[in-house]
């Protein structure tokens, strides 16, 4: 994993005051002067959440660093992502079968993922689950991911208010994660844009965005003396607002990255 460069990217991941362990993961990796950033959130309700998030995150970092990209475009990065996602599933299955000898409490270990690939001109965002990516500029925070949860799935199906109400206690349940289910269809979210006037890219887990209003992201970051202080201030604000989860943020100064 590439060490953070506080001039244009950094990150932070902490357990928080409630959880017994930190099941989040974040990291950075380079390939041909292009940058990958990733945040994973292991499923807290299951055994092995920390194992899953670390295995998945580290695999994406290492395979990005070692892959020979012939070109940097949407088709190429999507193909790389899909192949790496397949490998992640098989590694989770292998981990379950060999390391944990198919112990039933580890059968549902899984992780979310949000991942950004940055060239000097483009941003490619992939996600699975409910970890998020925001683009920040002009005192605004634009959410560019869409949570894979029951609510969004029902809305996409044009569910009426009555049906939504009947699932009111389950609407935030995840409908897509990275798990050991190797035969499931590959489903992921994707977003691509040019680096223009955007100032920051923020990837984060729900322990942060559920407890800090996105309208405050830009102010907190730009009022901090550097990126390292910015991610700590985001963490501190989520604690002040009673976050009950692990808290992870990975932050890139896009203009400094573009010029580096």
UniProtKB/Swiss-Prot annotation:
Known EC number: 3.1.3.16
InterPro entries hit by this protein: PP2C, PPM-type-like_dom_sf, PPM-type_phosphatase-like_dom
Pfam families: PP2C_2
Catalyzed reaction equations: O-phospho-L-seryl-[protein] + H2O = L-seryl-[protein] + phosphate; O-phospho-L-threonyl-[protein] + H2O = L-threonyl-[protein] + phosphate
Alphabetical GO biological process terms: signal transduction
Gene Ontology molecular function, alphabetical: protein serine/threonine phosphatase activity
Keywords: Hydrolase, Protein phosphatase
Class of the enzyme per the UniProt entry, highest EC level: hydrolase
Domain PPM-type phosphatase: 9-254
CDD domains referenced in this protein's UniProt entry, alphabetically: PP2Cc
Protein name, UniProt field: Putative protein phosphatase
Organism: Mycoplasma genitalium (strain ATCC 33530 / DSM 19775 / NCTC 10195 / G37) (Mycoplasmoides genitalium)
Organism lineage: Bacteria, Bacillati, Mycoplasmatota, Mycoplasmoidales, Mycoplasmoidaceae
């Amino acid at each position: 994993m590439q060490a953070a460069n506080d001039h244009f990217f950094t990150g932070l991941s902490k357990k928080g005051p409630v959880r017994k362990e930190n099941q989040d993961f974040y990291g950075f990796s380079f390939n041909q002067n292009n940058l990958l950033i990733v945040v994973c959130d292991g499923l807290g309700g299951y055994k092995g959440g920390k194992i899953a998030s670390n295995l998945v995150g580290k695999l994406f970092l290492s395979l990005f660093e070692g892959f020979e990209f012939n070109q940097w475009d949407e088709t190429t990065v999507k193909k790389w992502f899909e192949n790496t996602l397949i490998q992640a599933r098989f590694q989770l299955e292998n981990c379950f079968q060999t390391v944990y000898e198919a112990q039933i409490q580890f059968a549902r270990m899984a992780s979310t993922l949000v991942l950004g690939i940055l060239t000097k001109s483009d941003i490619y965002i992939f996600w699975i689950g409910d970890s998020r990516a925001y683009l920040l500029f002009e005192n605004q925070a634009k959410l560019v991911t869409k949570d894979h949860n029951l609510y969004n799935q029902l809305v996409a199906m044009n569910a009426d208010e009555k049906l939504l109400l009947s699932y009111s206690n389950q609407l935030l349940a995840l409908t897509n994660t990275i798990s050991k289910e190797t035969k499931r269809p590959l489903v992921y979210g994707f977003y691509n844009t040019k680096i223009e006037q955007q100032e920051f890219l923020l990837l984060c887990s729900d322990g942060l965005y559920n407890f800090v209003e996105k309208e405050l992201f830009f102010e907190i970051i730009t009022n901090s003396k550097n990126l390292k202080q910015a991610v700590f201030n985001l963490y501190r604000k989520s604690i002040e607002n009673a976050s009950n989860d692990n808290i992870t943020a990975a932050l890139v100064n896009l203009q400094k990255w573009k010029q580096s």
